[in-house]
Design a protein with these regions (language model features):
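Acyltransferase donor/substrate-recognition loop-hinge adjacent to the catalytic core
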Residues: 41-93
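Active-site beta-strand termini and strand-to-loop segments that position acidic
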Residues: 61, 98-100, 192
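…primarily DNA-binding HTH/wHTH and HhH modules…
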Residues: 183-193
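Conserved active-site alpha-helix within GNAT-family acetyltransferase domains
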Residues: 22-54, 143, 167-185
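Conserved GNAT acetyl-CoA-binding A-motif
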Residues: 12-34, 153-164
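Ligand-binding pocket scaffold of soluble enzyme catalytic domains
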Residues: 77-79, 99, 107, 130, ...
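Conserved acetyl-CoA-binding loop-helix of GNAT-fold acetyltransferases
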Residues: 1-16, 129-132, 138-151, 155, ...
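A conserved beta-strand-loop-helix scaffold within acyl/acetyltransferase catalytic domains
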Residues: 87-93, 98-131
Length: 193
C-alpha cells in the first residue's frame, strides 16, 4: 500500500451507519477495539503516523440455525467436512471441495476460544475463511460451503456464529446478510508507516 494512501471514514451521521469500531495494536497484545466516537484517540493515532490499512464488517448470528445442506452445485465434486482439534472444547471444521485435481474452494471455521478465553467463546463458531477459486465463482459454491460448515458446527453444539468481511467485499457481505448474519460492528485496522 502506498505510503500516502489513507481511507476516509464513511460520511454521514453516526446513527445512519452500523456501530463503528477502530482496531489498533496495543503494546504486547493483539488488536484492540475502540469506538470511533472517541475522536481524540483516532486523532492521536493519526498525529503519530498511523493510517487506516483496512476496514472490516463484523457479523454475528446468535442461535444460528442453518438451512440443512442442499445438493452440491456439482454432484461430481468431492466435498469433505473435517473435524480438526483446535483450542476450544469443540473441534474446528474445515470444509474442502475439489473437482478432480482442481480446488473449488474451502470454508475454515474455528472455535471462538481460539481468540478469547471467556467461557462463552467456547460455543461461538467463527468462520475464519471462505474462499472459492475464480473459475468456480458465481455457481453457488460459496453459499454451499458456508451452509455445509455451519450445519457441521451446529451438529457439534456450537450456538452462535460470527464472521468478518473486508469493507469493500460487497458480494460476500450480501451473501452473509442474506443467509442470516447481521452486522454488529465496523472496524479499522491502523498501521504505522
Amino acid at each position: 500500500m502506498p505510503r500516502h494512501y489513507q481511507k476516509r471514514l464513511p460520511p454521514g451521521p453516526r446513527s445512519e451507519s452500523p456501530a463503528k469500531m477502530t482496531s489498533y495494536r496495543f503494546y504486547q497484545l493483539g488488536c484492540g477495539m475502540v469506538s470511533t466516537d472517541l475522536g481524540h484517540l483516532i486523532g492521536l493515532l493519526g498525529v503519530n503516523g498511523y493510517s487506516v490499512r483496512s476496514d472490516l464488517y463484523f457479523l454475528h448470528w446468535p442461535h444460528f440455525d442453518p438451512v440443512k445442506s442442499s445438493t452440491s452445485p456439482n454432484p461430481s465434486a468431492d466435498v469433505v467436512a473435517k473435524h480438526v482439534q483446535g483450542r476450544g472444547d469443540l473441534p474446528d471444521v474445515d470444509v474442502l471441495a475439489h473437482l478432480g485435481d482442481r480446488s473449488i474452494g474451502d470454508c475454515i471455521c474455528e472455535s471462538g476460544a481460539t481468540y478469547a478465553r471467556a467461557q462463552d467463546a467456547q460455543r461461538l463458531f467463527y468462520v475464519d475463511w471462505l474462499g472459492v477459486s475464480d473459475e468456480f465463482q458465481g455457481h453457488g459454491w460459496g453459499a454451499y460451503l458456508l451452509r455445509r460448515a455451519l450445519t457441521a458446527g451446529r451438529r457439534l453444539s456450537y450456538e452462535h456464529a460470527a464472521i468478518a468481511v473486508e469493507g469493500d467485499n460487497h458480494r460476500a457481505l450480501l451473501l452473509y446478510t442474506n443467509y442470516g448474519f447481521r452486522v454488529v460492528g465496523y472496524g479499522y485496522d491502523f498501521c504505522r508507516d
